[in-house]
Amino acid sequence: ITLPDRELACAPIDSPLGQEYLGAMRAAINCALANRQIVTHLVRQAFAEILPHADLSLMYDVSHNTCKVEEHRVGNQSRRLFVHRKGATRAFGPGHPDIPPDLQTIGQPVLIGGTMGTASYLLVGTAESMNMAYGSACHGAGRSMSRHQATRQWKGGKVIDDLAKEGILIRSPSKRGVAEEAPGAYKDVTAVVDAAEAAQLARKVAKMRPLICIKG
């Protein structure tokens, strides 16, 4: 394959290498899903020790940074496509057959996490997103600087103290990790969410502020 740029390296889907890539990616998605299930179980156990009758039900679980085989309208035809979502997640609109029955009339939940010090958002996919972006929306604001740059600008201990003054508790074994994830190292999540809604890629449902943040 002749490439106009080495960054566009690719492999035909039906080639052995292409199939190996898809298999490895799907294994990674399954690993991440299993990891989230384990974290959910541990959180439920922790809550049960203090609030034995608490019911922590899972609202939704969704993967991002994936490539999935989907049916979409291209022009006047329905086509089977491999949809790559990098820095993005599914945002299927109401009535899509891949949405769970209890969410069919609403649309697919879109979870957009903020930083340790900013809001996170719950959105839902739209019919317009299906037409414009193959049912896709952002899954976060994205970094405004590298982790290395963040550690040069912030100290983990100072970040923890500043967030504590705002009523946000941070728990992390690594102060360097906290510095890498400093709120200032990310773009404005509210501006990103507003832009996604203005573009009709997703619709805002709820805004949530952090109380406790656990960094691995």
Q: Can you annotate each of these PLM segments?
A:
Residues 1-216:
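Domain-length cofactor-binding catalytic modules of enzymes
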